[in-house]
């Protein structure tokens, strides 16, 4: 099993089986970053350090994820949501090509913003759509996870306690 106290990132379960291939991640959001950031387990205050949000979606092969998972479950977790070899494509506000979108991760001035982030294959030299087996897709052997967090490093217990992300 997993020790939740010593391995909190592994306690999460990311991914919902799907039978379609995502090509973009769209949503409306507004974000107000907090003014103080907290770091690690000791919650040291770093005045003036701006927080920023995390908004991303990950499309992955859940059969491969299950084979890689020591608990034999077809999900990703906080320790491998960006690094698992089962990942096929990612749509990430933080790394998207649209500079205007990226600036909104630092705040939207109370305004609702619409984003449409294309998925990018992990291997940029290969069209990720060609990596998906249509028969396996029908059997929901691929999964999608969506993560939205008011602090980009919230999974590491770092961020501002007064940041607000509304989806």
Question: How does the language model describe each region?
Answer:
Residues 60-167:
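Terminal, low-complexity interaction segments
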């Amino acid at each position: 099993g997993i020790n939740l106290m010593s391995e909190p990132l592994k306690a999460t379960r990311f991914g919902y089986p799907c039978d379609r291939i995502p090509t973009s991640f769209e949503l409306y959001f507004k974000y107000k970053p907090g003014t103080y950031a907290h770091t690690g387990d000791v919650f040291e205050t770093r005045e003036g350090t701006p927080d920023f949000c995390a908004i991303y979606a990950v499309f992955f092969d859940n059969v491969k994820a299950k084979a890689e998972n020591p608990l034999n479950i077809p999900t990703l977790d906080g320790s491998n949501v960006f690094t698992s070899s089962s990942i096929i494509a990612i749509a990430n506000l933080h790394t998207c090509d649209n500079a205007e979108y990226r600036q909104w991760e630092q705040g939207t001035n109370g305004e609702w913003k619409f984003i449409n982030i294309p998925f990018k294959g992990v291997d940029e030299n290969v069209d990720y759509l060609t990596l998906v087996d249509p028969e396996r897709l029908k059997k929901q052997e691929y999964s999608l996870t969506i993560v939205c967090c008011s602090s980009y490093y919230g999974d590491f217990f770092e961020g501002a306690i007064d940041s607000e992300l509304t989806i």
